[in-house]
């Protein structure tokens, strides 16, 4: 958020944070509060959306939640909006190995796209070449 605030200051655009509560983890309300407080600190508009709790604990739970999350993003994004996601290098590695274990072919092993169209806007993942530990280290310095 700190880097986006710097960009906003120099480029004059609206910055909005979107928090999705999946209602899966026991600390999900605490995470929402943390995100909301952080956005207040940075003076960033905060939108939160709570997904309906899924009763069946199928192996597809993660996919179902992802699909619901992206449908919300598609509805929420305005024309020419950019949605920045926090996916990082560790996610790329995890996705590759999970796909390989499932027996995906060459196309199924392709990397997470750095950007793609989403609804009326665009989804961008600026941290795909940075590890989670490096992101956390940078955040602690801020």
Predicted regions and their residues:
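Core alpha/beta nucleotide-donor-binding catalytic domains of modification enzymes
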Residues: 1-142
């Amino acid at each position: 958020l700190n880097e986006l605030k710097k960009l906003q200051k120099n480029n004059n655009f609206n910055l909005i944070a979107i928090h999705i509560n999946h209602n899966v983890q026991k600390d999900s309300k605490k995470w929402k509060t943390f995100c909301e407080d952080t956005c207040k600190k940075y003076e960033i508009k905060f939108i939160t959306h709570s997904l309906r709790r899924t009763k069946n604990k199928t192996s597809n739970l993660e996919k179902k939640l992802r699909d619901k999350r992206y449908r919300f993003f598609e509805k929420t994004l305005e024309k020419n909006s950019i949605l920045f996601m926090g996916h990082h290098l560790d996610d790329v590695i995890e996705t590759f190995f999970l796909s390989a274990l499932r027996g995906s072919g060459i196309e199924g092993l392709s990397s997470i796209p750095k950007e793609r169209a989403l609804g009326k806007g665009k989804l961008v993942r600026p941290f795909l070449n940075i590890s989670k530990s490096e992101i956390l280290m940078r955040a602690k310095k801020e």
